[in-house]
């Protein structure tokens, strides 16, 4: 049996079959695509979206508020213009998610016209990421790379190491999620961090409401704090 939504390729039909084969009183869905959350919101079984692209979908859930405007502004103040966000494809298709739209708006505010270079579609596969990085570094290498997951970050660090690219000397590197792994890195990876207690309390309250037969679809979010770390710095000088 598949162990995650990623193993199911966020395929609504496959997920629907899995749900039908495993009856439950309620579902908690982690970091799902918009299409998946739309499907769950239309089912009679209560569902909770723990993160994921759920803007305007009538489903209970929680999320994180990361101030990408401040992050992008700080990068631009250090001379960065070639800023790239590597994000899952479901944030880009069939339409931009709230998160991807916020990144575009942050670029526009500082005078950068966003395009496919800044938000590339790469298929969320290891080989797709390598092809994407090859393309980015072929002509106009990015001066700042923003990632969304530790697996993507590790792949980028491996790619950099094989080519003698270092952060922050050659490119600033930021991950949007925290990880205990970062404490083992020297320099520590720049990232966002947040308190999960309020998010977990909300899940417990939702579960209690579901047990009482209440139709609870409230969404909450918590504010993340930017941890600068040591992988972000000024644009490298031209060689």
Segments and roles (model prediction):
Residues 19-31, 82-87, 118-119, 139-152, ...:
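Periplasmic-binding protein-like
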Residues 38-45, 105-107, 156-165:
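Glycosyltransferases and closely related glycan-assembly transferases
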Residues 55-86, 126-134, 153, 193-213:
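Hydrophobic alpha-helical segments within soluble ligand-binding/sensing domains
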Residues 133-239:
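Flexible loop/turn connectors
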């Amino acid at each position: 049996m598949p162990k995650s939504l990623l193993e199911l390729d966020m395929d609504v039909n496959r997920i629907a079959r899995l749900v039908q084969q495993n009856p439950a009183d309620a579902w908690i869905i982690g970091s799902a695509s918009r299409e998946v959350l739309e499907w769950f919101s239309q089912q009679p079984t209560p569902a909770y979206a723990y993160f994921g692209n759920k803007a305007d979908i009538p489903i209970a859930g929680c999320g994180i508020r990361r101030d990408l405007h401040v992050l992008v502004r700080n990068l631009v103040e250090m001379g960065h213009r070639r800023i790239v966000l590597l994000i899952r494809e479901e944030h880009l298709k069939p339409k931009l998610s709230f998160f991807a739209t916020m990144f575009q708006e942050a670029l526009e505010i500082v005078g950068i016209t966003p395009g496919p270079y800044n938000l590339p579609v790469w298929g969320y596969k290891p080989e797709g990421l390598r092809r994407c990085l090859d393309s980015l570094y072929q002509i106009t290498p990015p001066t700042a790379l923003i990632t969304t997951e530790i697996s993507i970050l590790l792949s980028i660090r491996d790619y950099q190491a094989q080519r003698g690219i270092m952060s922050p000397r050659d490119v600033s590197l930021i991950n949007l999620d925290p990880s205990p792994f970062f404490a083992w890195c020297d320099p520590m990876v720049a990232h966002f961090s947040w308190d999960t207690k309020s998010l977990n309390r909300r899940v417990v309250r939702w579960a209690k409401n579901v047990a009482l037969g209440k139709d609870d679809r409230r969404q909450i979010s918590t504010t993340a704090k930017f941890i600068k770390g040591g992988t972000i710095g000024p644009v490298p000088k031209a060689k």
